[in-house]
Amino acid sequence: MRLLHTIIVALACLGIQPAAAQEAQPFRILFDWGKPELTRDAEATLREVTADFRRSQPAQVDIAGHSDRSGPAGVNLAASRRRAEAAKSFLIAQGIPADRIAVAAFGESRPFVPTEDGVREAQNRRVEIRFMR
């Protein structure tokens, strides 16, 4: 079941989803280079996520972690996972039930801004959060 959930999250992040699912515009938070810690701006955005969650009561919150291409692929994948987990922990602390949150990590495989290998691109060090209805 968890694998199926991860696959659904991955497909949603690619813009592919079941016809019954309705997806709102994603929230996007950025991270400093080499850091999984949430910035003040990220925390403010996650508070918006929490408020929207309470208003709209989506079935699920999908969190997708990403990284830039400034390090080895394995390190970047781990960094994207830590960033996604940081966002999840914050949302849980704000009262969103853990069982309504799914996390996926994509490392450097889905850049927001295409770059060459080794490039530090702030927009690629991100977490995207979507509601699934």
State where each predicted segment sits.
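Periplasmic OmpA-like peptidoglycan-binding domain that tethers envelope proteins to the cell wall
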Residues: 66-133
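A short small-residue
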Residues: 26-30, 65-69
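Sec/Tat signal peptide C-region and signal peptidase I cleavage site
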Residues: 17-21
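Solvent-exposed, flexible loop/coil residues
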Residues: 5, 33-35, 42, 110, ...
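Periplasmic peptidoglycan-binding/anchoring modules of Gram-negative envelope and division proteins
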Residues: 31-64, 92, 129-131
